[in-house]
């Protein structure tokens, strides 16, 4: 059990080196109405081998492999407060977060708007 978890985490960290997909135009935080804004270490397409592996390990089947997924994400409650900054990619996801390991249906957020 621990080996499976450690393998999953190790593969998720390798995803940082994976090429990023063509990013859609970021939206302002006020347009995120599907759940809390997430801060993800990596945002990639579901067709990415690492994302596909994580989805498979979690038993998640997606119809559209071009959908953006966030890997190793954590929620940002209120932007601008100390401790709520995001040094990676802030995204708005479709409230499909699996324990922070992967979030599905993500759109980049421009927190500077």
From Swiss-Prot:
Disulfide bonds join 32-92, 39-86, 40-73, 93-106. Pfam families: Hydrophobin. One of its GO terms (molecular function) is structural constituent of cell wall. Residues 1-17 form the signal peptide. Its main location: secreted. It comes from the Eukaryota. Keywords: Cell wall, Disulfide bond, Secreted, Signal. It is found in: Secreted; Secreted, Cell wall. GO terms for cellular component: extracellular region; fungal-type cell wall. Coiled coil: none annotated. The keyword Signal applies. Self-assembles to form functional amyloid fibrils called rodlets. Self-assembly into fibrillar rodlets occurs spontaneously at hydrophobic:hydrophilic interfaces and the rodlets further associate laterally to form amphipathic monolayers. Aerial growth, conidiation, and dispersal of filamentous fungi in the environment rely upon a capability of their secreting small amphipathic proteins called hydrophobins (HPBs) with low sequence identity. Class I can self-assemble into an outermost layer of rodlet bundles on aerial cell surfaces, conferring cellular hydrophobicity that supports fungal growth, development and dispersal; whereas Class II form highly ordered films at water-air interfaces through intermolecular interactions but contribute nothing to the rodlet structure. Belongs to the fungal hydrophobin family. This is Class I hydrophobin 1. It comes from Coprinopsis cinerea.
């Amino acid at each position: 059990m621990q080996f499976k978890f450690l393998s999953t985490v190790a593969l998720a960290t390798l995803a940082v080196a994976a090429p990023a997909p063509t990013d859609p135009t970021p939206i302002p935080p006020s347009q995120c109405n599907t759940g809390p804004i997430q801060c993800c270490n990596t945002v990639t397409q579901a067709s990415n081998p690492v994302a596909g592996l994580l989805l498979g390990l979690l038993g998640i089947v997606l119809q559209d492999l071009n959908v953006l997924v966030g890997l190793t994400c954590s929620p940002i409650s209120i932007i601008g407060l100390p401790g709520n900054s995001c040094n990676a990619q802030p995204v708005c996801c479709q409230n499909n977060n699996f324990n922070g390991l992967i979030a599905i249906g993500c759109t980049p957020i421009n927190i500077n708007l």
